[in-house]
């Protein structure tokens, strides 16, 4: 049964420091439960209400800075994983907002994302506070930006955009549909301590990917493993028009149990969005699972310094370790796309 937790979109007071009570953002939804459908309330009115509540906290100058026309295709695609100092973003910077304004924006994120997705994003965001600014580069939660493209509406399309170093969420809302693609899902450091607990924002995703690799036979690994060292992202910022690269092992070559494991891996991304939209999202992916490929570059160990990619008609996922700044396994770049629905192409007409 699909469930939607009750969430009040306004009047929410949220802590501005991510807690570290869990070691990873969430346990992925089992594939056997992920695509069961039932009637649930439309999420869009709550997202619109929360966004309008956020706008009501802003000054006239701030509203002008944060709002862009729906026809502004440049702003829709203006995002990067680079830190402040290497990339110029537009909108409102988090560090310049009041506490009331911050809490109002967090309510927008919380109603758009699932509880688990919100936790993952907050953990990735908080990781940036572990990095030291210097050399003209600035790191930390204060250097994340908010932009609104179009007018918040329950009927006509619009987009909210939030991001900074290693994390970007592009949320396109059109009627009852919410699309979170493309989004940059990374972390540096990939493991850190908060309130005495170890936090691994992407730990469950790595575990799911390695479990899938480990389940493959020698013959299957010959198809899936494409190289002995990790590679960089193919579908990162600025690669919106790049055609999908289908390589690795196809879903059609997997056993039923392995297909379940592949769906479990994918659910770590598909479940970023609220429960209502996540169920439909997983159904789309499951319908084309036989044409969805899993590829691996790097050591076949659990060390975390390997790249993997999931590529299908409805999903592109990349996980790419980076050597810059220390151990590759502790610096992750990641992407989540839908080749048919990036920036809501399939739902905005």
Predicted regions and their residues:
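A cross-kingdom marker for long, charged
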Residues: 23-349
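Secretory targeting and sorting signals
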Residues: 1-28
């Amino acid at each position: 049964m699909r469930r939607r937790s009750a969430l009040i979109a306004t009047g929410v007071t949220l802590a501005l420091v991510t807690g570290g009570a869990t070691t990873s953002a969430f346990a992925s939804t089992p594939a056997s439960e992920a695509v069961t459908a039932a009637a649930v309330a439309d999420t869009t009115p709550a997202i619109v209400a929360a966004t309008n509540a956020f706008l009501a906290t802003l000054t006239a100058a701030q509203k002008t800075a944060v709002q862009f026309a729906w026809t502004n295709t440049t702003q829709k695609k203006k995002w990067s994983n680079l830190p402040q100092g290497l990339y110029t973003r537009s909108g409102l910077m988090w560090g310049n907002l009041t506490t009331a304004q911050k809490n109002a924006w967090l309510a927008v994120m919380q109603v758009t994302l699932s509880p688990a997705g919100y936790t993952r994003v907050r953990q990735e965001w908080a990781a940036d506070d572990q990095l030291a600014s210097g050399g003209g580069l600035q790191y930390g939660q204060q250097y994340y930006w908010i932009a609104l493209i179009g007018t918040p509406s329950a009927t006509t399309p619009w987009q909210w955009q939030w991001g900074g170093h290693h994390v970007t969420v592009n949320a396109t809302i059109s009627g009852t549909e919410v699309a979170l693609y493309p989004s940059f899902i990374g972390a540096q450091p990939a493991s850190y301590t908060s309130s005495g607990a170890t936090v691994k924002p992407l730990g469950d995703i790595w575990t799911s990917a390695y479990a899938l690799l480990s389940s493959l036979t020698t013959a299957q690994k010959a198809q899936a493993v494409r190289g002995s060292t990790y590679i960089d992202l193919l579908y990162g910022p600025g690669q919106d028009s790049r055609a999908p690269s289908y390589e690795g092992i196809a879903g059609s070559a997997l056993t039923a149990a392995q297909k379940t494991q592949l769906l479990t891996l994918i659910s770590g991304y598909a479940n970023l969005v609220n429960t209502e939209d996540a169920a439909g999202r997983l159904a789309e992916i499951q319908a084309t699972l036989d044409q969805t490929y899993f590829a691996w570059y790097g050591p076949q160990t659990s060390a975390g310094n390997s790249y993997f990619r999931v590529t299908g008609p409805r999903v592109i996922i990349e996980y790419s370790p980076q050597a810059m700044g220390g151990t590759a396994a502790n610096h992750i770049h990641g992407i989540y796309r839908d080749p048919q629905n990036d920036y809501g192409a399939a739902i905005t007409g």
